[in-house]
Amino acid sequence: MKGALGMSKKVVLAYSGGLDTSIIIPWLKENYGYEVIAMAADLGQGEELEPLNEKAINTGATKIYIEDVKEEFVTEFIWPTLKAGAVYEGKYLLGTSFARPLIAKRLVEIARKEGAEAIAHGATGKGNDQVRFELTVKALAPDLKIVAPWREWDIRSREDAIDYAQARNIPVPVKKDRPYSMDRNLWHLSHEGADLESPWNEPQNDLFMICTPPEQAPDKPEYVEIEFEKGIPVKLNGEALGPVEMIEKLNAIAAAHGVGICDMVENRLVGMKSRGVYETPAGTVLYAAHRELEYLCLDRATMHYKEMVALRYAELVYDGVWYHPLRKAIDAFVDVTQETVTGLVRMKLFKGSVTPAGAKSPYSLYNEEFSTFGRDEVYNQKDAEGFINLFGLPMKVRALMEQKSGLK
């Protein structure tokens, strides 16, 4: 059977083995007659991928690709976002947001290889992920059809989805009495739904799967030293590490101290607010350490402008327009700012908090001879008078005008 473009009637599905994508395989076959090729991206979720080969085939897929993209995930998506200092709405470290463009990119590559006419995903019609998947496909392969079952079928809730799965003897890793929606990768673990849908409900300690609840964390702080080269972390406690290993090791250390828990109500791109609880231990430490190094190495004008750029960068990533020319242009600016962001940062981890405990850099702009409160021989305090007179001249001129005109 051939599609309109002459390709085999195949669809490549972004597959996780979770509830949504487990039921999408039979649904695509029943409603579209597609041959379903599943693709699961190994983003660092570990043992969750082990049973997917058998599960996807048993559910009706003809083939499954399990793609190890961890290295690319860190070097091409996480590090640029870290260097930019991009944080969405002051809290969210974008763990799901920048994973989706990578998954969609790989879907496109497999679709080309297999001669598929369509790509399918399990994102709901209420969320941001549908936008992130589909904008990436539009940017990289505008001719491919996109199938989004949650916008088409009669299933209206996770409970309906569980019923659909059970009717077809499809095992799913959720229970009806606790149907959290979770997304896990090397960078973070997110939790949404169930009792979290009320912002008044405090997350229970048994929710956390990575981080130790802060009140149960060790009573003694732990110090970590992170070395950066041009904004990229390269050593942890003096040990040179690759990008994936850096995050894995720091995750274990920081999570043990309850660092990295984020509970927030965020503004979704599609217009509604949602509540999520995120566990991002390594990311929380790396962002804080990177920022401390920038305090030393960036001048005032560059730092302040970069802060504005970081806000826009975070919006671009969150909104799913990773492949927009503006993000690439901002990357070029950020790379210039990071040329001197090289040095060593010491951070203290204690019961959920991460605080700076020292920083040094060969490119530090902090000069003790100028900054000291003690006696110095390099700064003439009399010079400040002329600076103040010139800097304050516009304010003085306006005040004189207001006095003369009676406005004051």
UniProtKB/Swiss-Prot annotation:
L-citrulline binds at residues 92, 97, 128, 132, 181, 190, 266, 278. GO terms for cellular component: cytoplasm. Pathway: Amino-acid biosynthesis; L-arginine biosynthesis; L-arginine from L-ornithine and carbamoyl phosphate: step 2/3. It catalyses: L-citrulline + L-aspartate + ATP = 2-(N(omega)-L-arginino)succinate + AMP + diphosphate + H(+). L-aspartate binds at residues 124, 128-129. ATP binds at residues 14-22, 41, 122. CDD domains: ASS. Its EC number is 6.3.4.5. GO terms for molecular function: argininosuccinate synthase activity; ATP binding. Belongs to the argininosuccinate synthase family. Type 1 subfamily. This is Argininosuccinate synthase. The gene is argG.
